[in-house]
Amino acid sequence: GKIVNGSKIILSTTKDNDNQMLYIMPPLDQNIKEGLYGKSGLMYKGNGGSYLNYYQIGTGKKHLFLNFSIHGFEDSYDKDGAELTYMANEFWKYLKDNMSEELIQEWTVYILPVSNPDGQYNGWTNQGPGRTTVYSWAPENEGIDMNRCFPVGWTKLNSSRNYTGEQPLQAYEAEALREFILTNVGNENFVIDVHGWLNETIGNNELGSFYRDEFGISNHIGTYGKGYFIQWARSIPNTKSMLLELPEVKSHNELMQKGYVNKFNTATMNLLKSY
C-alpha cells in the first residue's frame, strides 16, 4: 500500500522469532488512526491466532491508554472479556463523533480493545487458558496471566489461573503491550486497564473516582498489585495508572440494560476534560 504522511510504521522483534514485522496503516483522517502492534502467541505457534490491534485519535502531548480484555475470560461467564472489547469498540465510535477539536489538540487517546485475543477467542476457562494467554514462550508454552507477569513486583506463580512463567513478560502479548506503551509515551500519561467484575478501582484514586462516580462503585484499593500491568505502567515517568473492575453482569443484555457503555464513555470524557 501507499505510505502517506502520518502513516505509522512499527518494527518489532519478539523472543524465539527473528523476523521483523512491518505494519503500515494509513490514517483514516488527519487525527484518527487504526493499526497493529504485534501478534498473539498462537500466531507465533503458526496455529491461527490474531494480530494485536489498536485505535488512536488526537495529536496532543497528554496520552491516555485504555486497555481491555487482558483476561479473555473474567469470572462471570465464558468469554466475558468480550463485553470489555464491546465497550472499547463502542467508545471508539463515540470518540470519533464527540471528541472536540480542543481535546484532539490536547490529547492522544489509544484504545487497545483486546490485548489477549487468544484467551478471548480460543481459550476455554477462567482458571487457565482463556483468562491467561493460550501459547507463550514459558516452559511447555503454558499460558501466562498477563496481569501478573509485568516486571515491577513480579512474583513467580505456578497455578494455571495466575501462571507467570519463569521470568517476567513470557507472554508474547505482554511484551507487545509493554513495547507499545513505551513507544507512544507523551509528556503526561494515563493508563487505565479495564476488567470485570469485582466492583472496585485499584491504583490511582483520582483516576478511579471518575468511574466510581458513574458506576456507583464504592470500593477503592490504593495499591497496584504484584506484576500488574498498572504497577509497571506507573513506573514510567509522569504516568498515572488505574485498574477498573466493573460491577458484575451476567449477560450482554444486562450490560446494555445497565448502560455500561454510556457510563464508561461519560467517565472517560470527564477525565479528558479534567486534566
PLM features: residue spans?
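OB-fold/S1-family single-stranded nucleic acid-binding modules
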Residues: 12-31
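Active-site-adjacent mobile loop/cap segments within catalytic or ligand-binding domains
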Residues: 15-16, 191, 200-214, 222-275
